[in-house]
Amino acid sequence: MSSHIVTPGPYRATKLWNEVTKLFRAGMPLKKHRQHFRVYTNCFTASTAVDWLHELLKNNSNFGPDVTRQQTVQLLKKFLKNHVIEDVKGRWGMEDLEDNSQLYRFPSTSPLKPIPNRPTVMRRKSLSMMDRESFFKFRGSKKFDKETLENVDPETQESPVGSSSGETERSRELTEDDIHVIWKNVTLTHLQKLVGSASLEGVLDPAKVNPQFIVYNMTKVNKHGVVSLEDKTEDLPHWALSAMKCLANWPKYDSDQPTYLGFERDVFKTVSDYFYSLPQPLLTYQYYELFVNILVMCGYITTPKSQPGKRKNQEEPNCPQPAKNPYVNPANLFRSTEYLLLSLIRKEAIDEADSPMKEVFSSKTETKLDTRRVFRGRRVSDGDRLDGSYLDVSQAHKTDVPYGRLRPRSCSLEGNINNCAKSRLFRSSESLESCSSDKSNPETDSPLEPNLQSSLVSINTSGSSVSSQLSADLRRNNSRPARARPRSIGNLFDIEENREMSASSFSVHAPVAEITMRPDSTSSVGFRGLGLSSLHGSCVDVRTGPSFSRRCQSSLDLSKPAPARPPSALLTHQPEQSLLQPSLEQVAVEALQLCTLLLPPASRRKLQLLLRMISRMSQNVDMPRLHDVIGTRTLLVQTFSRCVLSCEEVDDLDELLATRLLSFLMDHHQEVLQVPVYLRNAVEDHINYLKSLSSCPGSAGPIPSYSFCRQISCQEFEQQKLSVSQSALADLLENIIKDKSMSVKEKKKKIKLFQKEYPDIYSRRFPTTESETQLFADKPKIKPPMLLSIKKAKTFSIRN
């Protein structure tokens, strides 16, 4: 018996149940067995059933080879509980099946479960209406075709019989609303299957998802993949878009315009002010929980290494739980048959001919190169810093640097300072050309060989001179009038002036995240050694001296993708374990790809343009420094994190989550914000499947369509309740009176019972006693003629 693929949709677990039970009953071999001196025919042992059903599930296209034997035993227990099978003595209803030689057989009843024709909520409402009090219930013959149309407009019921076939054909056609519902259901089903969750309850409310946004974001895009808005009032204003293009294509954008010192900082502030003026973040408050749970599900968290001799509690907030497997553990006992069946569905990539979801579970193989370097008795140079975060050298002397990953540089704007003049320290006008002549040999064993250290600038100056110079620069920077900002970005620009600074320790108030980029446009964000309660940590970041030239193509438009960049190595101090599991990185990209389709088109367009702008800015070597201390990439992430993700109730964890999400989106914006082709193919396949069912003459029936009653007021309902019920009872009394087949005695009995229960209706029918007596007036009896009786008697006597 051949199997067919159960497509995603409502009642999928029921369809899978029917499919498996059909195949099991049709193919399970039955034999004669002997047990306890008795012979049983057409039965099978439990171990044989487990073996056969296990092979069936592994070879079935709906489940796949990942089905375990324990899951098969659990499914057979559900079969025994639901009377798909029974033991040879006819017992069933319990899940006491074991993988042994116990004998079982198939019952004579059908194990298939009926698929409901309407949602459960409607059924509960209809049953509650049917259970209302109705005192006088009479049985009668009813036409079922009239009952099925009781909720339809009466004008459509009175249509002639000849047009019924045409109406059926028209009802099978898919409307625009039906197509929107298909888009919504397929998208949410793919997202639910991708994250491996039984349901999205508590994270996403499907009723609040607008399917028109999904269709618009999938279809209304330009050649660069950016959403095109029909309503231009929702688009970015012209001045904001021009400012974003200016920063993205710096310095070649509109070079004829006059510029001044600090022009790029003013433009950057203009763009940030615009995004902070929006009423909601770009990912909206509605989907805050959804995006946060995607990060948690994909393991985008850090787990600090436990120190020897200490036992940390896993429940503490500064020790996050390790990432869990997104799929249901097959060893668990499933109390629900639906969860058990859905857990058996195959999880690997499905063939293109079988399902359009061939790309959902594809994971990207990532090569990691670990190297161990120990730095002792060495001063931290300014080239060692990354994104403006530092570590006290006293710690570097005491502690060995653990394993680090070789990763490309996230930005070539930081870490290269001209050492010929101390007065130019931490200024935005510094150039990278000073280290262009100090290129390193690519065949060196370590990024920190002596020939590379010529490109690094040592801060071997007195603590007083460096501290005074830094304080002067900060006071000059803070002298400008600045717009009040939320604390998520305000701490980037505010540095404690009275804090002690030395040549070996510069403590910056805010930057706590190290963000790097991989050669294949993937990324990882390292939050190093920081509990959630203390955000002011310090770390050492060692950056290689050589830098390749990564210049933006200024002739391109802002909406075009950023150019590819060659890889380079970065050895980073990383005292924690892996940050993002490589096997789940592709899952996170595709999950965010589906989640961003739920956004309003205007928010999605702004998110696309913002991510393309900050991605280009972080890669542009010609971009002047936007802050004297903070690195360009860190400044971009911390500035726009609250503009992208934020919740209505601000908590302490909000900033870290928003920073991590924006860092991930920056490095994967081309994959996350592109239109998923597999989703479009899945919707088209589902629509074509429904159309083929409607056009097939031998199909099971039309597509089920639901009709609903017109809502009326309470007063009108009370009037209809009285009038309709009383008229029906009056008709009942009239039928009793006019019934000629009923005897007078029985008729009197029923009329008296009716008079007792409904005196008002009876008094309206018989207002006076005369009308009642007239109905039951005794009719005169006609006696037979006496002569005929005499003749009959005489004749009888003569014959005798």
From Swiss-Prot:
Q: Which UniProt keywords apply?
A: GTPase activation
Disulfide pairs here are: none
Disordered: annotated span: 147-173, 306-326, 459-485
The Rho-GAP domain covers 281-321
Regions of biased composition (Low complexity) lie at 459-468
Q: Name one GO molecular function term.
A: GTPase activator activity
Tell me where the signal peptide lies. Answer: none
Amino-acid biosynthesis recorded as keyword: no
InterPro entries, per the entry = DEP_dom (IPR000591), Rho_GTPase_activation_prot (IPR008936), WH-like_DNA-bd_sf (IPR036388), WH_DNA-bd_sf (IPR036390)
Q: Which residues form the DEP domain?
A: 24-108
Which GO annotations describe the biological process of this protein?
intracellular signal transduction
This chain's protein is named DEP domain-containing protein 1A
